UniProtKB/Swiss-Prot annotation:
This is Cell division topological specificity factor. It comes from Thioalkalivibrio sulfidiphilus (strain HL-EbGR7). Disulfide bonds: none annotated. Pfam families: MinE. Prevents the cell division inhibition by proteins MinC and MinD at internal division sites while permitting inhibition at polar sites. This ensures cell division at the proper site by restricting the formation of a division septum at the midpoint of the long axis of the cell. The keyword Lipoprotein does not apply. InterPro entries: MinE, MinE_sf.
Amino acid sequence: MNFFNYFRSQKKKSAQVAKERLQVIVARERVHRDGPDYLPRLQEEILNVIRKYVQVDEDAVSIQLERDGDCEVLELNVTLPEHKA
């Protein structure tokens, strides 16, 4: 009987899974909450400027703000399409 109980105890209960997922969501919200309000608008404006010159998708521009003590770094990544020669 103990052999079967061992395998049954390996499954996570739905409450535990829900708790872990909620912790991940709360952690992500805390990271985004501390970010400045202008980042989404900045990303949209940068995308519009890039689109004046190159056809790119919505997800071609990503902006991240990283904080390290009293220093903030704004990281901008733009994925440009390959230029065919």
